[in-house]
Amino acid sequence: MDINIDDILAELDKETTAVDSTKITQGSSSTTHRDANTIVGSSLDLNDKTQIYVSPQQDFSDLMKSWKNERCSPELLPYPHQLMKRLLNRISMQSQLIENISMGFLDMQNASNANPPMPNESKLPLLCMETELERLKFVIRSYIRCRLSKIDKFSLYLRQLNEDENSLISLTDLLSKDEIKYHDTHSLIWLKLVNDSILKYMPEELQAINDTEGSVNMIDEPDWNKFVFIHVNGPPDGKWNEDPLLQENEFGKPCYTVTIPDLKEEVELTIGSIYVMRYEVIRDLLRDDKVALI
């Protein structure tokens, strides 16, 4: 099976084709109440598992945070399944709305309801909607491409992670379904290429590609000692009193305490401040969404 980046990004362009007019002329109330001020699809979205209202603005903010974290992180971060599902659904709905407006279906409905159709001078909001939608697609594409580049780079590391029974995170949580397919196909092609080109001509004891017992680790792992810039956000749910890791420093400000292994020193990370730290030191705080990479 041949899988490339176009297969994973195809979902972003599925709903940009022409809309069937027979579905529009039914006078659905869910379409007529929308106008050119809609940001990304419907403003009402319910998470199927938790039934928590999530606004489009919050989804966009979470996407930008995930995008920045992924680009600045040396490792592959967990895939935000629910966030991406909502965003792709909003993109589909907004694309359909823009298509309806551009083809004049909403103008026809306004005329039938004794309302004047939209004049040509008022098409500017439509252009703004299209521009904003393309900006959102660009961020999602950049986010996915960044993840795919890490999947290519750490292919053997991900295979080892998947086979490790003591791993704290599963591959299904770390990758999306399409990314898992891409990873499996890419790793098989790469292993076959290396075996046919090099390994089969070498002695059997030298054919292992995942040897970690020698002086050089053959598995390319993320650089855990990489320095990163972080912004300390605090508890993501806003429940400051329920966070067991949150403390107060000598100035009475809330902070997190981390330990630098090399120096065996503790450092206080004050809420709202910016620091430069090794990634390994703040990795757990990043996973808990208590700090953000910048």
Swiss-Prot record:
<dbReference type="InterPro" id="IPR038749">
    <property type="entry name" value="Sld5_GINS_A"/>
</dbReference>
<keyword id="KW-0539">Nucleus</keyword>
<dbReference type="GO" id="GO:0006261">
    <property type="term" value="P:DNA-templated DNA replication"/>
</dbReference>
<comment type="function">
    <text>Required for DNA replication. Functions as part of the GINS complex which plays an essential role in the initiation of DNA replication by binding to DNA replication origins and facilitating the assembly of the DNA replication machinery.</text>
</comment>
<dbReference type="GO" id="GO:0043596">
    <property type="term" value="C:nuclear replication fork"/>
</dbReference>
<dbReference type="GO" id="GO:0031261">
    <property type="term" value="C:DNA replication preinitiation complex"/>
</dbReference>
<dbReference type="GO" id="GO:0071162">
    <property type="term" value="C:CMG complex"/>
</dbReference>
<comment type="subunit">
    <text>Component of the GINS complex which is a heterotetramer composed of SLD5, PSF1, PSF2 and PSF3. Interacts with PSF2.</text>
</comment>
<dbReference type="GO" id="GO:0005634">
    <property type="term" value="C:nucleus"/>
</dbReference>
<dbReference type="GO" id="GO:0000727">
    <property type="term" value="P:double-strand break repair via break-induced replication"/>
</dbReference>
<dbReference type="InterPro" id="IPR021151">
    <property type="entry name" value="GINS_A"/>
</dbReference>
<dbReference type="Pfam" id="PF05916">
    <property type="entry name" value="Sld5"/>
</dbReference>
<keyword id="KW-0235">DNA replication</keyword>
<dbReference type="InterPro" id="IPR036224">
    <property type="entry name" value="GINS_bundle-like_dom_sf"/>
</dbReference>
<comment type="similarity">
    <text>Belongs to the GINS4/SLD5 family.</text>
</comment>
<dbReference type="InterPro" id="IPR008591">
    <property type="entry name" value="GINS_Sld5"/>
</dbReference>
<dbReference type="Pfam" id="PF16922">
    <property type="entry name" value="SLD5_C"/>
</dbReference>
<dbReference type="InterPro" id="IPR031633">
    <property type="entry name" value="SLD5_C"/>
</dbReference>
<protein>
    <recommendedName>
        <fullName>DNA replication complex GINS protein SLD5</fullName>
    </recommendedName>
</protein>
<dbReference type="GO" id="GO:0000811">
    <property type="term" value="C:GINS complex"/>
</dbReference>
